[in-house]
Amino acid sequence: MASNDTIADMLTRIRNACAVRHPTTKVPTTKMTRSIAQVLKQEGFIEDFSEAGEGVGKHLVISLKYKGKTRQPIITTLKRVSKPGLRVYSPCKDLPRVLGGIGIAIVSTSQGIMTDREARRQGVGGEVLCYIW
């Protein structure tokens, strides 16, 4: 099924896969989902990701990360902030701190997709896409 909000679709697929402890999940590939997956990997929320398929059927295979013998998911919450019907923009000085810095906010800036910490360091604001902790 085609989705108008690929970011929400990606977050939902990751959330559902973590809930049932799947080792991987597939997400349709776009530049935005690839960039978000890169940030998640850099921040240690996922193990790795790779592209599979060709043309229209191209997708990202995301390897999820768990901890301990009980395989508790590293990602406890994924929350979409800016939606197609209600965009949320924030200047550099007003970028949110997620759980006092424990979690991250993923921000789409003129410099690309990055975490709230990187955006503050570079002095740029942008669209707050989602919160993750």
UniProtKB/Swiss-Prot annotation:
Gene3D superfamilies cross-referenced by the UniProt entry: 3.30.1370.30, 3.30.1490.10
A UniProt-annotated Pfam family: Ribosomal_S8
GO annotations of cellular component type: ribonucleoprotein complex; ribosome
Superkingdom of the source species: Bacteria
InterPro entries named among the record's database cross-references: Ribosomal_uS8, Ribosomal_uS8_CS, Ribosomal_uS8_sf
GO biological process: translation
Biological function: One of the primary rRNA binding proteins, it binds directly to 16S rRNA central domain where it helps coordinate assembly of the platform of the 30S subunit.
Protein name per the record: Small ribosomal subunit protein uS8
Organism: Gloeothece citriformis (strain PCC 7424)
Gene field: rpsH
